[in-house]
């Protein structure tokens, strides 16, 4: 990544649980990978939905990503600095909204590894011109509640709940 920072679009998708006394935006403002933009999962979700952090609508995603200046043929690299692996959520969002899966990556080891390896960081932000990002939803990547309910009888697909027991 370090050798290709000028050829890729980098996003810090760090997110912390409420009450953690950490602020991902403040951390980003202090230090981040050069050229990175902060991807605020709170603000870049479906704000019209009563539930928090829901996937934005296609029109919302188009606006969000266009405002970041990302083009459909950009290689996007996402990282985070939290234990929640929020970078994977943003990775999935790019794939769901039609970005070429070969052009979306999660930084191996995240920002922690980047820092351990003493790679360059900055507090400077880079501005990008607005783009006209095109969205093509891959609706087959999300299973709806009605499909889960139906599957209780049909056993059409295997479902695994990876949450902790708590």
Functional labels for PLM-detected ranges:
Residues 1-26, 34, 111-166:
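Flexible, polar/low-complexity N-terminal or interdomain linker segments that lie immediately upstream
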């Amino acid at each position: 990544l370090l050798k290709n920072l000028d050829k890729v679009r980098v996003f810090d998708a760090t997110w912390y649980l409420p009450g953690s006394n950490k602020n991902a935006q403040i951390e980003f403002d202090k230090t981040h990978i050069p050229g990175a933009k902060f991807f605020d999962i709170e603000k870049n979700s479906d704000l019209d939905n009563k539930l928090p952090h829901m996937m934005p609508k296609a029109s919302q995603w188009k606006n969000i990503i266009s405002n970041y200046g990302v083009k459909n043929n950009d290689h996007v690299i996402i990282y985070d600095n939290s234990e929640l692996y929020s970078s994977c959520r943003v990775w999935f969002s790019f794939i769901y909204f039609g970005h070429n899966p070969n052009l979306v990556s999660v930084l191996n080891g995240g920002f922690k590894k980047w820092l351990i390896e003493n790679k360059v960081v900055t507090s400077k932000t880079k501005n990008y011109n607005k783009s006209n990002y095109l969205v093509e939803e891959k609706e087959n990547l999300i299973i709806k509640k009605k499909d889960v309910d139906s599957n209780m009888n049909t056993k059409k697909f295997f479902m695994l709940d990876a949450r902790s027991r708590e």
